[in-house]
Amino acid sequence: MRSILAATVVGASLAAASLSVAQEAQKVGPDEVQQALVGKVWEVELPDGSSATERFNVDGTVTIHGGLNDKGYWRLWEEGYCTTWFRMRNGAERCFTLDRTADGKYRVYKPNGEISMTILGTKEQ
């Protein structure tokens, strides 16, 4: 009887932990990128803690200033968005996935799963 009770408690704890993580961050696809991030100025934090400002323009151009300085192009992708910068990555395109945290920040992930940046807030251009 004790082992059944212990298994029930452990199972309930794991379920609660899974629910907590699921509520913490929601995967973001291209529809939300289009609605919430395109045509906005992003205030971002880079992985090294430095700040930058990124302009994600409606015309498909993008600029970043601060910890990095570059310009290039972006496009929507089935799982998020892709960028091609003039200098960064020698002009190679890279696609990113995103999630939105419970406090409204967007975390942007590289293909290898590392965080590329965290969007702390956005404002209209």
Language model features: what each stretch is:
Residues 2-3, 7-11, 17-125:
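Lipid interaction determinants
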